[in-house]
Structure formats: C-alpha cells, structure tokens
C-alpha cells in the first residue's frame, strides 16, 4: 500500500478540503485499498518527506523536493483538476 | 460526486457559526494586501475571536505560504494561520474597493489581483470540513463569486449566504 501525504501550511484548512476530495476520488476509482492517506502541515513533514510515496501540497515547497510534489491547488479552484488526478493515478499505479 | 448542497452545516441559532459575528467589509479600502489583512485581523481581534498574535501569524504565513487563488478570471484569497491563535472559529469577509495583489497559493512567483478575501479563523479540521468544502464549491463558481463581490450591505450578504446555504 502506498503512502499518500496531503499537506498545507497549517494542516487545517486547505489540506482538509484536498483530503476530502482525494478520498472521494479514490473511492470512485476503486483505488482506496491501494493508498493510505496522511494529512499534515509542511513544517512537520519536511524532515521525513522520504517516507511517503506520493505527496500533494497546496503550499510552496522547498526547491529540493519540488520534483516529487504534486500541486494540489487545482482541487481548490477546479482548474486543472483532471490532470492532477491523472498524475496521482500514475504514481499510485507505478 | 457527492453534492455539497445536500450536506448538513453546523448552525447556531439558525445561522452558520462561521459567519455569525458579522466580521464583514463591503468595498474595503486597502492600499495593499498587508493593509487589507491588518484591517480584517484587527476586526477579528476586537471581537475577541482571535488572540493578539493572530495578525502577525496571518501576515507571516501569507509571505511564506501565499493564499491567493485564481478562479478563471477572478482572484480571491483565503488567508489563515495556526489554530492556536484562534479563540472561536469565524470567517471574516471583505470585498475590496480596488483589487490588491496576492501571490498564488502553491506558486512562489505569480500574482493575482484579488477582489474578495475570506479570512479563515479556524480550529480543528473535523468540525469544519463540511463548511470548508461548501465554501470551496462556491469558490469554483465564478458567477457566485461575482455576486459576493457585488454585495453592498450586510443584508445583501446575508441573503447570499442563505442562497448558497452557508447561512
């Protein structure tokens, strides 16, 4: 089972929304048994970021981890949502 | 997809608890984002909804983790900070007389002209997920955002909240 981290700056507002949407999407696509979801704030995760397989962030991340982080903002604005889900799906099935 | 309009929202005396203190600004005059954020945070502080460190928290957080969102051609921002600076959950609302620049969430470089600000003073996440999801549903609807921007009074605002079932 892959570990999927969803993080934002405070761990209470935007990551809550994104977690809810990702959970719904996982269920709709029958992927809920393939991933375990974690919701947190960025400051608590940077030191152990390598423990996760997939990372979605609504907030800015340091340059050194940028390549492995999926931008979660499309789930807040609705623009670019499908592409974002495709990215997650690719990583789940990889 | 689960429809948000069918879900329950916590209410106090018939009114959603997140807007019950009327921390609202219609056509707020602000020189820049810091000025707008200060005025809104001060209002929350004066109503004893947040601690004295809330303003500083919001301003610092906005610089590190910007909260501007571009919804089509519409710009809005959802500034917030850690929950330990919040006494009672509330959302402050402002429509701006002239848009101010915010940096985009999740993107360090681009800016967006913001004409609506929802300042979130929130506690634990479980209590507010329904409300947050509904709010986000509204944020994805440019027509509704325009209606929020056109609110001229508390009456207009109340009516709109009721219409979108946030009241």
What is each PLM-predicted segment?
Chain B
Residues 1-167:
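Cytosolic covalent-transfer regions centered on His/Cys nucleophiles
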């Amino acid at each position: 089972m892959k570990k999927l981290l969803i993080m934002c700056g405070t761990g209470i507002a935007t990551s809550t929304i994104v977690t809810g949407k990702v959970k719904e999407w996982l269920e709709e696509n029958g992927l809920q048994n393939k991933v375990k979801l974690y919701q947190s704030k960025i400051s608590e995760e940077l030191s152990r970021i390598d423990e996760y397989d997939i990372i979605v962030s609504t907030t800015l991340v340091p340059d050194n981890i940028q390549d492995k982080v999926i931008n979660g903002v499309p789930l807040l604005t609705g623009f670019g949502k499908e592409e974002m889900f495709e990215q997650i799906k690719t990583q789940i099935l990889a | 997809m689960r429809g948000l309009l069918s879900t329950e929202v916590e209410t106090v005396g018939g009114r959603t608890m997140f807007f019950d203190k009327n921390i609202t600004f219609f056509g707020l005059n602000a020189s820049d984002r810091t000025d707008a954020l200060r005025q809104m945070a001060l209002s929350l502080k004066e109503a004893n909804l947040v601690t004295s460190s809330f303003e500083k928290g919001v301003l610092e957080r906005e610089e590190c983790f910007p909260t501007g969102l571009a919804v089509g051609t519409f710009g809005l921002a959802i500034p917030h900070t850690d929950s330990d600076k919040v006494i009672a959950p509330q959302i402050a609302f402002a429509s701006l007389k002239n848009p101010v620049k915010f940096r985009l969430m999740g993107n360090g470089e681009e800016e967006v002209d913001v004409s609506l600000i929802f300042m979130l003073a929130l506690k634990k996440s479980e209590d507010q997920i329904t409300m947050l999801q509904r709010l986000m549903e509204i944020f994805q609807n440019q027509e509704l955002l325009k209606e929020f921007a056109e609110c001229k009074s508390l009456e207009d605002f109340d009516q709109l909240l009721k219409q979108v079932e946030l009241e």
